[in-house]
Amino acid sequence: LRPIPQEILAHEAFTGFENPGRVNPGLVYGTISRQEVLPDILSGYEKRSFGEQVDGRIENIVDVVSGVLSMGGLKCNGEFQMIRGVAIYPQDYFCCFNFETQGFETTENTVSIHHYFASWTPLGRRIHFKLVKAAAAFLGKERYLALKRKIKGERAV
């Protein structure tokens, strides 16, 4: 959408949350060479056999990087943090995707958009995502979320 601002590029390394609990370097990961976190991320790859299930899904790079940063003190709250020289930006900077409605919500902070096609997921899951997106677009975000909560028996936030 726009060039990465100089104040972001000035960090040794930077990336962003895809949601409050997970840092996704697939959105963006900029770094200087030999930044102190990189060996730990690479080591995380060497120790894993990808394809394993984690929380009902296939483990991926998000799990590796979030784990390394968590060991460095990352708080999974979606707020800006500096962990071992890595600036982690809130979701609206590099991932303005709303997973609940399958739509985009840009802000004045938004630098880029990652299109989640979820091509690695089973066909049934991809169809589910498309149905959610269509329902949210048809009903409107607020009505869709209210209906979803009512069906699940959740209280309104």
Which role does the model predict for each range below?
Residues 2-157:
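Glycosyltransferase-associated regions of secretory-pathway enzymes
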